[in-house]
């Protein structure tokens, strides 16, 4: 009888009581976001019209490494946390690798992804402030579904702008949001000035996260007692996601191992930061030798081909100016099925860490991600979301290197969500309809030309 342990699960009383704020430990702090009107460093009160006040302070906190998780939020975390750390014996066998592969299974949440970790927190802070309405954007619909559920939990009305290509590709995510009472609008739309401007110039525009953010911000500004919420990119969102890595840290101890490589797929940075930052703390403070890999789509390679500049997080220029690796806020990504990764820029924390060499980035073509996603499903029994397939592909690449070297490296990746509502994407892959989208240098240069140098 085998004594090998497959899953490592923490009891409820070991769910983290604090989020980890890596900004407090970074030797080189991120450059300050700028007020778009004055070009002066952003102050928390500059963000009050958009976000709940506590979130504004979390966003710019450079001093406190540990932020207490409100007890109400932690009680809701118990609905699905802790999430399992799983030893991927099946994948190891399929690859014939000596590497030890682990994944943190965030697909077990009620929504099927990691996004609920921040949605519950943001909705809680909005409710505490007396807010009645929240708006947001969503790509594939994972964040929109999470925010819709969290809003319902705290008695808030939710309005979601979903990127049009994903709105059409993933109708069941729309149904999930509507099940929780949210109003869902395809973006760009004619309901906002930002949307009208884009559709006037490009009537068949299929949308982008940057466009959907503009519309959600505009609606929040024009709706009484309303706040905007965001699913990635900003630092407070990444903060909430560190519950993933903090749990994984304890679970790796249970497994008797420590990762040589930690991997997360990359859209705006919250999923990557959530799994990586708690381990990166040991690299910064103790000199642990761990590689941290952000796996991004070849069609939206902001980390591997973008420039480090001050840029907006949205197409219309409503957000603060963020110091980040960007392809330009006017960038229109290809219509890949990993809708949650179709964002032009990276969060300020990740951008600074990449600039300082504390992490690395890897771009992965669409077809390779689906190939690896199918291999993972066949060997581990979980169909991964197209976004998560990027992390799997990066893990497979690293595990194959171990075949050549004979090293038993320990690889940890975050399975950010399941793909059971993304089967139309898999259908297109099996039918041979999907293709690889790769950007040319001249396309990137043209897109970057729209950035005003600060």
Descriptions of predicted regions:
Residues 143-206, 302-314, 423-431:
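Active-site-proximal loop->helix
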Residues 3-131:
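Positively charged, low-complexity intrinsically disordered leader regions
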Residues 116-120, 136-154, 168-171, 266-276, ...:
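Short glycine/serine/threonine-rich phosphate/pyrophosphate-binding segments
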Residues 68, 197-236, 244, 256, ...:
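Active-site/ligand-binding loops adjacent to catalytic centers
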């Amino acid at each position: 009888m085998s004594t090998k342990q497959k899953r490592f699960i923490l009891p409820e009383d070991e769910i983290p009581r604090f989020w980890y704020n890596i900004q407090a430990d970074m030797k080189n702090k991120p450059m300050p976001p700028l007020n778009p009107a004055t070009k002066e460093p952003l102050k928390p009160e500059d963000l009050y019209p958009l976000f709940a006040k506590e979130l504004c302070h979390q966003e710019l906190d450079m001093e406190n490494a540990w932020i207490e998780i409100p007890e109400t939020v932690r009680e809701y975390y118990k609905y699905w946390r802790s999430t399992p750390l799983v030893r991927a014996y099946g994948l190891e066998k399929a690859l014939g690798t000596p590497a030890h592969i682990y994944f943190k299974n965030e697909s077990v949440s009620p929504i099927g992804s990691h996004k609920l970790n921040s949605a519950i927190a943001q909705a809680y802070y909005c409710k505490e402030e007396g807010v009645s309405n929240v708006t947001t954007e969503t790509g594939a619909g994972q964040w929109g579904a999470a925010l819709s559920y969290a809003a319902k939990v705290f008695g808030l009305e939710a309005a979601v702008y979903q990127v049009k290509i994903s709105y059409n590709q993933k109708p069941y995510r729309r149904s999930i949001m509507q099940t929780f009472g949210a109003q869902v609008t395809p973006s760009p739309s004619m309901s906002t000035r930002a949307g009208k401007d884009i559709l006037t110039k490009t009537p068949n525009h299929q949308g982008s996260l940057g466009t959907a953010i503009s519309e959600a911000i505009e609606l929040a500004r024009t709706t009484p007692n309303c706040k905007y919420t965001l699913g990635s990119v900003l630092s407070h969102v990444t903060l909430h996601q560190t519950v993933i890595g903090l749990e994984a840290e304890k679970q790796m101890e249970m497994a008797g191992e420590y990762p040589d490589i930690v991997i997360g797929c990359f859209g705006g940075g919250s999923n990557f930061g959530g799994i990586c930052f708690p381990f990166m703390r040991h690299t910064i403070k103790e000199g642990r030798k761990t590689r941290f890999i952000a796996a991004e789509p070849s069609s939206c390679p902001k980390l591997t081909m973008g420039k480090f500049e001050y840029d907006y997080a949205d197409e219309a220029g409503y957000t603060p100016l963020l110091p980040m690796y960007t392809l330009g806020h006017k960038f229109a990504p290809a219509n890949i099925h990993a809708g949650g990764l179709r964002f032009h820029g990276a969060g300020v924390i990740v951008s600074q860490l990449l600039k300082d060499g504390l992490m690395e980035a890897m771009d992965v073509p669409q077809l390779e991600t689906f190939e690896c996603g199918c291999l993972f499903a066949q060997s581990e029994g979980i169909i991964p979301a197209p976004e998560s397939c990027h992390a799997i592909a990066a893990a497979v690449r690293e595990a194959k290197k171990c075949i050549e070297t004979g090293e038993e490296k320990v690889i940890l990746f975050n399975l950010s969500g399941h793909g059971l509502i993304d089967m139309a994407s898999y259908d297109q892959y099996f039918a041979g309809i999907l293709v690889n989208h790769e950007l040319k240098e001249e396309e990137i240069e043209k897109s970057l030309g729209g950035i005003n140098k600060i």
